[in-house]
Amino acid sequence: LVALAAVTGMGAAAANAMGTFVTISAVDVGYDEAAAGLVLALGSACGLISRLVAGAVADRARPDLLRMVAIMLGLGSVGFGLLALGHPVTFLVGLILGFGAGWAWPGVFNYAVAARFADRVATATSVTQTGVYVGAAAGPLLFGLVAEHFGASAAWLTSCGMMITATVMLLVVRR
């Protein structure tokens, strides 16, 4: 459970930083302020739709849930890498992948934990949710520090690295 909490911490750190810094980064890559707000709205809509679709797939298709989460985290990491390129088009594609996959995994993850630890759902999800909350709080702080000292591209690559780490950790832990 502690390893799963670390996975959620890394994933939430990267994803929550995206929500915090995406508009200022959109301006930095060439969008005006109004368009940057629309970019955030698009990302949020992608995240909402993706969460609903992922939930329906998890309910109906009965996939390996942790593998599904790992795929979502992996796709999210690609999105974060694209955000780092600093071009308006790749930024938009990265945003769609980042929100659509990289921040849509928590519901499926909680479902997987509840299914895997059916005899102690409350304890198991309490531990893994602790990772989410620690990561969600620490991610924007880390992103801001990296962006301040090394630039926004380095901060997005750091988030990409956290997502990749979460993906690899989850693939190892799920065995």
Locations of regions flagged by a protein language model:
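C-terminal transmembrane helical hairpin of 12-TM major facilitator-type secondary transporters
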Residues: 62-109
